A protein has these predicted regions:
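Glycine-rich, charged/polar anion/phosphate-binding loops
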Residues: 80-82, 303-306, 333, 362-364
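Short coil-to-beta-strand
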Residues: 91-92, 377-379
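Active-site-facing alpha/beta catalytic cores
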Residues: 102-103, 108-353, 393-396, 404, ...
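Non-transmembrane, aqueous-exposed alpha-helical and coiled segments at domain scale
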Residues: 330-333, 345-377, 383-432
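N-terminal amphipathic/basic-hydrophobic helices that include classical n-h-c signal peptides
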Residues: 1-31, 35
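Long, contiguous, compositionally biased segments that the model treats as domain-scale units
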Residues: 26-170
Length: 477
C-alpha cells in the first residue's frame, strides 16, 4: 500500500507452475466474482496449527461469504512490493518489517494504529539516512490476528480449555465460551483489517508521514532519551541534510508520502484461501488479504499444506528459519517457492537466537548464495530470545535482541553478503514487556503495562533505540 495507492506496474513474465490459466480472463477479475476457479490443492495435505471448529458447516458458510468479499489489497501492489524486495535481495535496499505479535480486535483504534505507524516511520527515517539505501517499510498489520501455539490446551487451577490462538480464532478470556473456536471471527478479522488498511492509507498520503515531521519526532526522542547523547550526531547529520535540501529549494513528493505495505503470517488456510483471487491481468493467483505473507517456523513442513498454499500464490513470500533449519531444507524452499529465481519473491526471515545465530547462519547463507538464488536475508531477533521471568511473564532482553542483530550483521560481513533487514515485534505504546533499553525496563517493572495477548514486544523507546543502533551497524558494514 504505497503513498500513491500503488499504481499498477508492468508484470514481469513469471512462473508457470500455478493452476491453469482461465480460458476466459475477461470474466475473472481481481475482485474474484469466481474465486473458486482455482483448486485449493493444500486441502489434501496435513495442515498444522489449524483450529478445531466444532461446527464445520458454520465454517463452510463463513468461507463462502469471505469468497464474495472484495480484496483488501491489489495484485499490482503485491507486484510493486516484490520489486522493492528484489532490491533488498540484490543489496540495494533494506527491509524494515514490524508490528504486533498478535493484533487484537479491541486495539483497532486511531491512536494505536497511528502510534505504531509513527514508530515504524521514525525507525525508517534513521535507517534510510544511515544505510544510504531505500528502506522498504512493511507492517505486521491488518491481518496478524492469529498465532501458532506450542500446546493445543491450557490448564489453570485444574481447568483445561483450548489455547488462545488469536482473536481471529477464539477469545482471550479463560472460560469455555470464549475459548471455543468461532468461524464468525474470520469475518471480523476481515473487517478489522479493512478498517486498519483504510486508516494507514490515509496517514501515509495525508501529510502525517512527511519526512520533516518524522525527523522532528526523532529529534524529540533524542532529547528525551537517556541514550540520546549517543544518537545526537546522527540526528544532527539528518537535520543538516534536510536543511540543505530546503535551502536548495528541493521538495520532492517522496518527502510528503510514503510507501507502506501490509503483511501477516499465512496461518489460517481457510481464511487465506477464501481471499485468494485470480488477477485479470495475468491469470495468476494472489492472496489479497495482504501484500506479503510468511510461513512460520511451526508450519514450514515441506510436505505440509502451508508450503503448498504459498507455492500457488504470486505474493512475496517469507519463510521463518529457526536454528534447526538444514541447508537441504533451505534449498528445497527455493525450488518449491521460487523455481524461476525471481529476486523479491522469497525472503528468509532468520530466527536463530542470540546464542546460535553466529554458528547456524553462515552455512545457510553460504550454500544458498552458492546455489545462485537471490533471496532477501532478514533477521527476526525476537522469537529466539524469549524467556519466562520469575513473575511468570514471558519477556525478552533488549541486549539479547540487539546481540542477535549484531551476529546477523557479522555473519553477512564475513561472507560479503547483504544483511537485508530486520523483522521486529513492536508497538508504538509505552508498554513494559521487554527488559532493558536506553530508557531501561527492569524485570520488576513488567507488571506495570504488560498488555500483549501473546509474545512480548519492544515498546516505542526500545524500538527507536534499536533503529539507531542498527544504523550504527549498517555504517560499519
Amino acid at each position: 500500500m504505497s503513498g500513491t495507492l500503488a499504481p499498477r506496474v508492468p508484470h514481469c513474465e513469471r512462473r508457470l507452475y500455478h493452476s491453469p490459466r482461465p480460458r476466459n480472463l475477461g470474466r475473472v477479475t481481481v475482485n474474484a466474482e469466481n474465486p473458486a476457479a482455482h483448486v485449493p490443492s493444500w486441502q489434501d495435505l496435513p495442515a498444522a496449527q489449524q483450529p478445531e471448529y466444532p461446527d464445520r458447516e458454520a465454517l463452510r458458510e463463513v468461507v463462502a461469504e469471505l469468497e464474495s468479499y472484495p480484496p483488501l489489497v491489489f495484485a499490482g501492489e503485491c507486484d510493486q512490493l516484490r520489486a522493492r524486495l528484489g532490491a533488498v535481495a540484490k543489496g540495494e535496499a533494506f527491509l524494515l518489517q514490524g508490528g504486533d505479535c498478535a493484533e487484537a480486535f479491541d486495539a483497532v483504534s486511531a491512536d494505536q494504529i497511528r502510534n505504531k505507524l509513527k514508530t515504524l516511520l521514525q525507525m525508517g527515517a534513521v535507517l534510510t539516512y544511515a544505510a544510504s539505501v531505500p528502506v522498504v517499510k512493511v507492517g505486521r498489520i491488518a491481518g496478524q490476528y492469529s498465532k501458532p501455539r506450542s500446546k493445543s490446551t491450557e490448564t489453570r487451577d485444574g481447568v483445561t480449555l483450548p489455547t488462545y490462538r488469536g482473536d481471529s480464532v477464539n477469545g482471550f478470556d479463560f472460560n469455555e465460551k470464549a475459548r471455543i473456536p468461532d468461524p464468525e471471527r474470520l469475518k471480523r478479522m476481515y473487517h478489522m483489517s479493512a478498517a486498519t488498511l483504510n486508516l494507514v492509507r490515509a496517514f501515509t498520503t495525508g501529510g502525517y508521514a512527511d519526512l520533516r515531521q518524522v525527523h522532528a519526532w526523532n529529534q524529540d526522542f533524542v532529547k528525551s532519551s537517556p541514550s540520546g547523547q549517543r544518537y545526537e550526531q546522527l540526528a544532527r547529520e539528518i537535520d543538516n541534510a534536510l536543511n540543505f535540501m530546503k535551502a536548495a529549494g528541493t521538495d520532492p513528493a517522496e518527502f510528503r508520502t510514503v510507501e507502506f505495505y501490509a503483511s501477516h503470517e499465512a496461518l489460517l488456510l481457510d481464511y487465506e484461501s477464501a481471499l485468494t483471487r485470480i488477477d485479470s491481468r495475468t491469470g495468476r493467483l494472489y492472496d489479497v488479504s495482504g501484500h506479503m505473507v510468511w510461513i512460520g517456523e511451526r508450519t514450514r513442513q515441506l510436505d505440509g499444506a502451508h508450503i503448498e498454499f504459498a507455492s500457488k500464490i504470486d505474493n512475496p513470500i517469507g519463510i521463518k528459519l529457526g536454528p534447526t533449519t538444514t541447508v537441504d531444507e533451505a534449498l528445497t524452499y527455493i525450488d518449491r517457492l521460487d523455481p524461476d529465481r525471481v529476486p523479491g519473491r522469497l525472503t528468509f526471515i532468520v530466527r536463530m537466537g542470540a546464542d546460535k545465530v553466529r554458528d547456524k547462519l553462515p552455512e545457510l547463507v553460504e550454500k544458498v548464495t552458492a546455489s545462485g538464488a537471490t533471496v532477501a536475508w532478514v533477521t527476526d531477533p525476537m522469537h529466539g530470545n524469549t524467556f519466562e521471568a520469575a513473575s511468570g511473564h514471558k519477556t525478552r532482553r533488549f541486549d539479547d535482541v540487539l546481540d542477535e542483530v549484531k551476529g546477523f550483521f557479522e555473519v553477512h560481513k564475513g561472507l560479503g553478503t547483504h544483511p537485508g533487514g530486520i523483522h521486529v515485534e513492536l508497538t508504538g505504546d509505552d508498554v513494559t514487556e521487554c527488559v532493558g533499553g536506553g530508557d531501561e525496563i527492569f524485570v520488576d517493572d513488567l507488571h506495570q503495562r504488560y498488555e500483549t495477548a501473546c509474545d512480548p514486544r519492544l515498546n516505542r523507546s526500545q524500538s527507536l533505540d534499536l533503529a539507531f543502533l542498527v544504523a550504527e551497524m549498517y555504517r560499519d558494514q
